[in-house]
């Protein structure tokens, strides 16, 4: 057949099978059945919020690395790819039965602790800075619907806690007066006064009975001494000018088994000036009855009159707020913010009056007459992470615990407060150390976990190393690359880890919701100051996280490589730590932190996955065929036979290669001859037989 005819001939058509059924008919015959479940099949827990958040971050990172536009469709596909990769990993046999317990650091758990006298002063905001000294904020409470939530507490303490109210271990309330002098306009008046009365802290005695004078001076703060004259009223008669000063004598607010608390602020009161008097002069100070109802002197008594044959003097002059501090058993900082909570528990009363001089029985007679027709309601508030626990608070110094049943959680105190209750200052815990259990060993990298699990299943099989090794190498490239993106598994069957995750997640959402700052007033110094306090706690938590090496399957808290040793830290010690009782556990927790930091540092110094890679390398060594040859060829004769067999195979391959080359040359020559013949006009007509033979043989 001529070559041109071969090119023009169409290829044969396929024979159509007449008995082939339509696809729709076959689809109708398909039956879908439920996936078979083994007795060991477990129901997967739904993904947590932290896992979904981590999945979104991983999908975003994967799209950025692949330079794919971030659309909802691409995000969904990337997330599904990560999920399919993670859930397809083989689960080793017996993993569910294994139990690994490690120490975990949980930042900002849903726990509170008492604010102690050793803590720094907290920020207490007032709604009226005209009459009360301090930062102002009239937007509190931030969430009125959450004020007064009921709570039962049982927490521990190491240093004495700060408590206000009529109970052992709490500072007692009392009424305090501040006096200023105004210009006198009446000819019979010696002095004209304006006085402010409000709730304050009750002094036990006016001096430390069991302290010498030299020892009391040891705790005298550095500051401006109080003036020797009564402060003059400012130009603005509606503003009370507060000026911090240090009085000449100290008062003791508490001196018992809970500690000794003193105050160097002035305590102004009227007393008789007996200087230059020849007759007996009562020098006792005139003060309200502290055992009576505290609110009675501020509500019912709107007129005060003091009369005497001796001049009235105002002792401890100065307009300064109380600043209590603890000096025994430890020495702590001053806490001026406590007075702002106390003074807001009832309205303050504004007085005006004068001191007149008359003559009775030919003797000078002095009268102080004060009247009041103005009261000012106040409100004081704290902001998260601080709160106020109000109720029947009981402090037990023997066990160092604080209990309160059916108490209320508040952030603000106003004039409706009932002093039959007590106030305990609390704050959110920065972090706790607890042991958690897992169903696998602690691992720092997800890629090492995936590599170990895949190769563990391969190495447990027989020595089908040729094709298996190729498949494993091809798979490891994709698995390792994807594991760097996945970062964390989406499902975990460890109940304790899930419990801690939910426990900490809810508290984080709670504190974050309470700590939100109004963006419209973010430039105010008070918000900035509170934000700095909150960010300081966050930085402390981040500092711990940077120093720790955490397990790869947790994101909201950190599971450390330190294994929990029950004999060294029994559960009762952990429980006391959760309650905040740090009596005998403080040194243990400090030692535990050092051990955990050392373990994390050791893991950071090593290449991630060094132990796993070493184990995999030992397993892959068994797949080396040279080791098989060594086990088979233990004698020289067998090794020689193997070499001869290899040489024979090599010779056979060479001969086959040469034969294939000859056949290829013959085919090329034949094709060249056919091409020459097809191009000649007239073919072989007119040529001799010899020429034809020569032409064909070319």
Swiss-Prot record:
GO terms for molecular function: structural molecule activity. Residues 1-88 form the signal peptide. Residues 1-25 are annotated as: Disordered. The keyword Cell membrane applies. The chain crosses the membrane at residues 632-652. The record marks 464-465 as: Cleavage. Residues 465-485 are annotated as: Fusion peptide. One of its GO terms (cellular component) is plasma membrane. Residues 653-698 are cytoplasmic. Pfam families: GP41, HERV-K_env_2, HERV-K_REC. Residues 10-20 have a biased composition (Basic residues). Glycans are attached at residues 99, 127, 152, 273, 354, 371, 460, 506, 553, 565, 584. Specific enzymatic cleavages in vivo yield the mature SU and TM proteins. Keywords: Cell membrane, Cleavage on pair of basic residues, Disulfide bond, ERV, Glycoprotein, Membrane, Signal, Transmembrane, Transmembrane helix, Transposable element, Viral envelope protein, Virion. Residues 89-631 are extracellular. ERVK-21 has a type 2 genome. The HERV-K(HML-2) family contains type 1 and type 2 genomes depending on the absence or presence of 292 nucleotides at the 5'-end of the env gene resulting in Env proteins of distinct sizes. Despite their overall retroviral envelope structure HERV-K(HML-2) type 1 envelope proteins lack a predictable signal sequence. Subgenomic RNA transcripts coding for full-length envelope proteins have been detected for both type of genomes. Belongs to the beta type-B retroviral envelope protein family. HERV class-II K(HML-2) env subfamily. The surface (SU) and transmembrane (TM) proteins form a heterodimer. SU and TM are attached by noncovalent interactions or by a labile interchain disulfide bond. Retroviral envelope proteins mediate receptor recognition and membrane fusion during early infection. Endogenous envelope proteins may have kept, lost or modified their original function during evolution. This endogenous envelope protein has lost its original fusogenic properties. This is Endogenous retrovirus group K member 21 Env polyprotein. The lineage of its organism: Eukaryota, Metazoa, Chordata, Craniata, Vertebrata. The gene is ERVK-21.
